[in-house]
């Protein structure tokens, strides 16, 4: 039996089915799926402030990403993958599989209030299934360490966009609680990469989950080790270097003979930053919005999955995916059990990774601060009751008149409003911030 056929037929119970309902049953767990006699490694690569307009396999006009493109050619590229448009809230959904009105991580500051006694993150789901886990890189706005949320090994730095020790927050970093000095001429992305390689080399005989949160391409944009003295485009240099590191990781997995048993997922934490969005064009067109907005340019992300012998090569998938979906997907892939004491909003897309139809989402949900929307393949409805025609997305979002007589628009409003009513974000944890998603109300900040 071929490996892909064995994996597909060995499933018992679909752990990744959406469980968006209260299941307050202590710490009981849902059964997972035993996918293989040798559990696959999971490598999750999270780029910072990278939108689809900066990845060449998505049609970017001004940037080339050959190694990321190679991942797409050898796997599946998703065209409708969404996440909250700022890094802290985005990472909260990625690691918990829960929407922001449930966790309270509705703005950057409030993300830091998440507690391991309340929220179960990905490592504590995978470890009982036999996985060793690591978080290497940016650790969002969380004041607690990755170890507090279950990671066995971690490297973290303070702030965002750390590259050289000339930066105010670039002097030191932490490895498993021990402070390390970033020395002169050491490049933080290279330091992180070496820790990635050391981790996978040390644990190559045991299934591992790697949460690799890159510095690139968050500001402050500085020259890379490969930038020439006369370089006029440090931003493009940074995208190129990020892509180079992805290629080096793939090469190392090949060298260690781990590629055939490793699921690689490449994703972005939010869209392109405002100052860079004008150049992040596709076919000469700028995306609507940018990082921090409630438009496509803020939340539509590159999502590429690659798993030799399992994920079919060169496939493009148009199903809706959002960032809560990684938790149930990785649990299903790992044969792990999902928590039953919390509502989990994610839908597993493991079937799509296998190249099968599966049961795709009908819509995704995105929130930032007190703003939210549901979006399906053609329409979007926000918290203000505004309906948008998304037929020209991601470049244009056309507001539909409230009194429209268009039967399709009327049906879409009814359908999406029912989805919002079922989720009831207004009944969840209220945002206490300044309305932008960037800061909590300073009077209420813990």
Question: Where are the regions a protein language model picked out?
Answer:
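Formylglycine-dependent sulfatase
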Residues: 2-385, 390-446
């Amino acid at each position: 039996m071929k490996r892909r056929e064995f994996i597909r037929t060995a499933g018992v119970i679909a752990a990744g089915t959406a469980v968006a309902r209260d299941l307050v049953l202590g710490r009981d767990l849902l059964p997972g799926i035993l996918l293989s006699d040798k559990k696959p490694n999971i490598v999750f690569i999270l780029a910072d402030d990278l939108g689809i307009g900066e990845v060449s396999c998505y049609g970017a006009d001004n940037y080339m990403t050959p190694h990321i493109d190679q991942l797409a050619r050898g796997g599946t590229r998703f065209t409708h993958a969404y996440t909250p448009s700022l890094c802290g809230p985005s990472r909260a959904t990625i690691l918990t599989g829960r929407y922001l009105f449930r966790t309270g991580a509705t703005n950057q500051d409030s993300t830091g209030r998440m507690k391991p006694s309340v929220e179960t993150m990905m490592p504590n789901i995978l470890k009982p299934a036999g996985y060793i886990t690591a978080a290497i890189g940016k650790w969002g706005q969380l004041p607690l360490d990755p170890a507090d949320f279950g990671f066995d090994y971690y490297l973290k730095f303070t702030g965002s966009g750390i590259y050289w020790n000339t930066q105010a927050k670039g002097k030191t970093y932490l490895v498993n609680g021990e402070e390390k000095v970033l020395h002169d001429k050491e490049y933080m992305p290279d330091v992180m990469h070496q820790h990635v390689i050391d981790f996978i080399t040390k644990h190559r005989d045991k299934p591992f989950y790697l949460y690799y949160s890159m510095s690139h391409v968050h500001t402050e944009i500085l020259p890379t080790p490969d930038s020439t003295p006369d370089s006029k485009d440090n931003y493009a240099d940074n995208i190129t270097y990020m892509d180079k590191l992805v290629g080096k990781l793939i090469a190392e997995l090949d060298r260690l003979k781990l590629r055939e048993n490793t699921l690689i997922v490449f994703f972005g934490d939010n869209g392109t930053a405002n100052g860079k969005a004008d150049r992040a064009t596709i076919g000469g067109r700028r995306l609507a919005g940018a990082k921090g907005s409630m438009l496509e340019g803020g939340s539509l992300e590159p999502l590429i999955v690659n798993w030799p012998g399992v994920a079919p090569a060169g496939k493009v998938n148009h199903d809706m995916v959002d960032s809560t979906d990684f938790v149930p997907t990785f649990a299903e892939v790992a044969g792990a059990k999902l928590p039953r004491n919390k509502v989990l909003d994610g839908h597993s897309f493991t079937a799509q990774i296998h190249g099968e139809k599966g049961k795709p989402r009908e819509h995704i949900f995105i929130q930032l601060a007190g703003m939210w929307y549901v979006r399906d393949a053609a329409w979007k409805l926000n918290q203000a009751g505004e309906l948008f025609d998304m037929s020209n997305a991601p470049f244009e979002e056309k507001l539909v008149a409230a009194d429209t007589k268009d039967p399709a628009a009327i049906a879409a409003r009814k359908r999406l409003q029912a989805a919002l009513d079922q989720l009831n974000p207004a009944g969840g944890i209220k945002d206490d911030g300044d309305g932008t998603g960037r800061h909590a109300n300073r009077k209420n900040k813990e």
